[in-house]
Design a protein with these regions (language model features):
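Short Gly/aromatic-enriched secondary-structure transition segments
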Residues: 27-35, 181-184
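Cysteine-centered functional microenvironments
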Residues: 55-58, 77-88, 115-123, 130-134, ...
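Alpha/beta catalytic cores of group-transfer enzymes, especially the acyltransferase/condensing modules
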Residues: 106-155, 253, 258-261
Length: 302
C-alpha cells in the first residue's frame, strides 16, 4: 500500500563497495556493504514536487522515484550525513530512502530496481544496480554478495572489529571529462587488457567473500592491494596522486589493505582497518579527509 496520501518518513544508508570495481555494468559480481551514514526523507502530499534540504540537486532524483512508484506530488525535506561526491553513493541513499517512505511494503529488490530506473530517468545515465541494492538490502554486520547479471545475492558476515575508512583523494572530476566512457567501451568490446581486470576482479570478489567467512584478514588485505594494482595497471583508471595515497595507506598503522574505490580518475580510496587503528591511521594521513564507517542495516532489511 502506498503511503503517499499521508506524512511519511524513509531512511536509507550510504554504501561502500568492498571489492568488485568496474564489473557491475558487465554483469559481474560485487561485494558492497551498507554503512552508518544515513539519508532521512520526510514527505507529505502537495500540489507539486518540492524539496527543502541540504542535498544539492536532489529533487530530480526524488521526483523520478516517486513517479516511478506512481506517487502523487510530495513536499519533501531531507537530512543527510552521506557526503556527496564521497564514494558513499549519496544519490542511491536519497532514492532508496524516498522509496522506503513512499512504499515500505515493497520487496527490497523491487525497490532497488525501481530506484535504478528512476536514477536512469533522472540522469540519462545507464547506472548499475549495486548502489541501490546495498542501500535497500544491506545488513549490519554483513556485506552483500551481489551478482549483477542474475541479481542473485546473499549476505556475507563482516567482522565487527574491522573498520572501513573512506579517504577523499581531493581530486574530483566529472566522468565526462575523463576516459571513463572509453574504458567502459573497451571492456565491453573485449579488449584483452581490460578483460584481464574484469575476470581477475570477479575472482577476487569470490576470494574476498571466502576470506571474510574464514576470518583470513591477511588475505583480505592482499586482495584489496591486488584489486588496486589491477585498476591501476590493467584498467588504467587510477592517477599518480591516487596511487601515492593508496601506498601511504598501505603502510599506515593498522591498515590491512586499501584500493581505489569507484569510477576512478580521483575520488575516494577505501581502506580496511583494525578497530583500534583509527587514531594512528588518521595521524598518518593528516592532509586528507578520512571518514570511518561501520556496516549498517539497509532500508528494507528485515
Amino acid at each position: 500500500m502506498s503511503t503517499s496520501d499521508r506524512t511519511w518518513i524513509g531512511r536509507a544508508p550510504g554504501r561502500v563497495n568492498l571489492i568488485g570495481e568496474h564489473v557491475d555494468y558487465l554483469g559481474g559480481v560485487v561485494l558492497p556493504a551498507a554503512v552508518d551514514r544515513f539519508t532521512t526523507v520526510r514527505g507529505h502530499p502537495a500540489d507539486d514536487w518540492s524539496m527543502a534540504s541540504g542535498v544539492p540537486g536532489g529533487l530530480p532524483y526524488a521526483r523520478a522515484v516517486g513517479e516511478e512508484l506512481g506517487a502523487s506530488p510530495q513536499a519533501l525535506s531531507v537530512v543527510s550525513d552521506v557526503p556527496p561526491a564521497s564514494g558513499l553513493s549519496s544519490s542511491a541513499a536519497l532514492l532508496v530512502a524516498t522509496a522506503a517512505g513512499l512504499r515500505p511494503d515493497l520487496d527490497g529488490a523491487e525497490a532497488a530496481l525501481a530506484c535504478q530506473r528512476a536514477e536512469q530517468r533522472a540522469t540519462g545515465v545507464q547506472v548499475g544496480v549495486m548502489d541501490q541494492f546495498a542501500a535497500a538490502l544491506g545488513r549490519r554486520g554483513h556485506a552483500l554478495l551481489l551478482d549483477c547479471g542474475t541479481l542473485d545475492y546473499r549476505l556475507v558476515p563482516f567482522p565487527g572489529d574491522l573498520v572501513l575508512a573512506v579517504i577523499d583523494s581531493g581530486i574530483h572530476r566529472s566522468l565526462a571529462d575523463t576516459p571513463y566512457n572509453l574504458r567502459r567501451r573497451e571492456a565491453e568490446s573485449g579488449m584483452p587488457q581490460r578483460r584481464r581486470h574484469v575476470e581477475s576482479e570477479i575472482r577476487r570478489v569470490h576470494e574476498f567473500a571466502d576470506a571474510l567467512e574464514a576470518g583470513d584478514r591477511s588475505a583480505l588485505g592482499e586482495l584489496l592491494k591486488a584489486s588496486h594494482r589491477s585498476l591501476r595497471d590493467d584498467f588504467e583508471v587510477s592517477t599518480p596522486e591516487v596511487d601515492a595515497l593508496v601506498e601511504r595507506a598501505w603502510v599506515a598503522p593498522g591498515c590491512l589493505g586499501a584500493r581505489l574505490m569507484g569510477a576512478g580518475f580521483g575520488g575516494s580510496v577505501l581502506a580496511l582497518l583494525e578497530m583500534g587503528a583509527k587514531d594512528p591511521f588518521r595521524e598518518a594521513l593528516p592532509d586528507v579527509v578520512v571518514r570511518f564507517c561501520n556496516t549498517a542495516d539497509g532500508a528494507y532489511a528485515r
